[in-house]
Amino acid sequence: MSKEIAKKRIEELRDLLNTFNYQYHVLDNPSVSDAEYDRNMQELIKLEAENPEFMSEDSPSVRVGGTVLDIFEKVTHKSPMLSLGNAFNEGDLRDFDRRVRQGIDDANVRYICELKIDGLAVSLHYEKGRFIQGATRGDGVTGEDITQNLKTIKAIPLRLNEEVTLEARGEAYMPKRSFVKLNEEKEQNGEDVFANPRNAAAGSIRQLDPKIAAKRNLSMFVYGLANVEEKTIPSHSESLDFLGELGFKTNPNRRTCETIEEVIAYVEEWQEKRPHLDYEIDGIVIKVDDVALQESLGTTAKSPRWAIAYKFPAEEVVTRLTGIELSVGRTGVVTPTAELEPVRVAGTIVRRASLHNEDLIREKDIRIGDYVVVKKAGDIIPEVVNVIFDKRTGEEEEYHMPTHCPACESELVRLEEEVALRCINPTCPAQIREGLIHFVSRNAMNIDGLGERVITQLFDADYIRTFADLYSLTKEQLLQLERFGEKSATNLVQAIENSKENSLERLLFGLGIRHVGAKAARTFAEHFETMDALVKATEEELKAINEIGEKMAQSVVAYFDNEDVLELLQQFKEYGVNMTYKGIKIADLQNVESYFAGKTVVLTGKLEVMGRSEAKKKIEALGGKVTGSVSKSTDLVVAGEAAGSKLAQAEKHNVEVWNEERFLQELNK
């Protein structure tokens, strides 16, 4: 076959396969058999392999999955992906309607209602009609680049029907039938199953190997247009129509409503129809349809005033409580958990539910053998709502919390003003394991690839008992563990080695000193600069630091007044773990050349590691100016957790937005 004929045939096959994909995954109306589709795909793959010069990034063949990735790169969203306020009942919906009408002084409001897909929110970027990048929502400001995995989802067009530049947003999800099939395969292979379709979708999207994502049969509904060049669309409903014309899959069950009564009827209708869908929904999204009215209403500190998410009531089911098991946390708190006869709740099989503490068991008179009502709080965490007393036979057993720790048999205590029972034995194995999980977590030592499962493996193999033991681990030890190969073992050893260079505040937070969170750890690290200086500090010296109270000061002094802790710190030194503050102190910032010099910065939301007042001082010390509102003269918005209206203003004025992690990176350069 000549090059010219091969090129022509490749183009024909691409057009044909794109049409087949659109008919099957968007229109849900396939025109060919699976066998015919596969024959055409195999022919295309063969021709592209023989003629690599004709390969294209938007070829249907890329949907089978490409090169394995080492890591997901971070992506800053051009406009923040905001969350919505919630409504839980008819009264909340009527309050929303009243606020909308008061806000625009106009009785002629039209709403658009859409099913709230329970999946993973993603953004899709197209340049001149070609799909160039996809990202997760992340924290709303920064997500992860998952382009290669999204290319495997056949409901996402790789090339649009127009050469338009835009950003679309939607929800990637796993159909129920695909979820059932996937879990059956995992059970057959002896692997852990996914709890629900949402977790399965999220886990599939974040696979480093796109070929795995390609096998998971994910789909996607696009629900919004974030940015589009050279085009003004007057309503949300028209933007969805436009997205459909471009080749996107939009949910066909949306409806425009002229009154709040029609909205409520739509909500009630889909609450009944919900179980019959082949995908999970957890509510209804209601938006003011007119874009001009949306802009007029604006946003609050947390969410748009023109939209709300109605959350379906948590599904409640009855099952039998067969036992109560106990778990011990890293601080020694002993938490009771109900063991249940397996029951399906909100799409997943539930075998356990939280009982919180002994007082709740007494208050609800929960006994072993009782029939109980179980629901998922927010459709996520199972909990026991109440006992069905009419079903009691008299054979149920009252439960009494133990007097000794289930993990180490030390006597349990109840501290003053606490409802929880605690184990105060510092050598309790359950506390040590949970403490190790905290030590390696993201805000602490941030050791990549070392989570709860691996910590448990290492602990059960008796490889680790203290934080310092992590730094003596070898590749040979890791290779003895299940699911570890040469590459993963090498990567983990290197990640542990890299963590030795962390600044002091991460180590302090990782130690899990009672009352000392990430922010306080940073305050101590900056003030004392070295671990040795902090260890020697008196309670009075600690209390003299701004925002450090008596309880925290006493806790820190008591922690370091312990021979085992001092021995641990000595081991850290021997392994080469850094125990000095690597950040910049405010007093040292005056002569530093900085990005912030001459910049106007707005801080919004909750900053976890560094409080806003401290961040303000540092920016100002570096020559920047911190203001309380976003305008055209703003250079940067730093957004923490639960940031709201200022993000929308940043989008309006095209101002750059950073999350806290990016801010700290720049600050510590």
Swiss-Prot record:
The gene is ligA. DNA ligase that catalyzes the formation of phosphodiester linkages between 5'-phosphoryl and 3'-hydroxyl groups in double-stranded DNA using NAD as a coenzyme and as the energy source for the reaction. It is essential for DNA replication and repair of damaged DNA. GO terms for cellular component: cytosol. It comes from Bacillus thuringiensis (strain Al Hakam). InterPro entries: BRCT_dom, BRCT_dom_sf, DisA/LigA_HHH, DNA_ligase, DNA_ligase_AS, DNA_ligase_CS, DNAligase_adenylation, DNAligase_N. Zn(2+) binds at C405, C408, C423, C428. Keywords: DNA damage, DNA repair, DNA replication, Ligase, Magnesium, Manganese, Metal-binding, NAD, Zinc. The active site is at K116. Residues 591-669 form the BRCT domain. Belongs to the NAD-dependent DNA ligase family. LigA subfamily. Gene3D superfamilies: 5' to 3' exonuclease, C-terminal subdomain, 6.20.10.30, BRCT domain, DNA ligase/mRNA capping enzyme, Helix hairpin bin, Nucleic acid-binding proteins. It catalyses: NAD(+) + (deoxyribonucleotide)n-3'-hydroxyl + 5'-phospho-(deoxyribonucleotide)m = (deoxyribonucleotide)n+m + AMP + beta-nicotinamide D-nucleotide. Pfam families: BRCT, DNA_ligase_aden, DNA_ligase_OB, DNA_ligase_ZBD, HHH_2, HHH_5, Nlig-Ia. This is DNA ligase. Its EC number is 6.5.1.2. NAD(+) binds at D34, A35, E36, Y37, D38, S83, L84, E114, R137, E171, K287, K311. One of its GO terms (biological process) is DNA repair. Its cofactor is Mg(2+); Mn(2+).
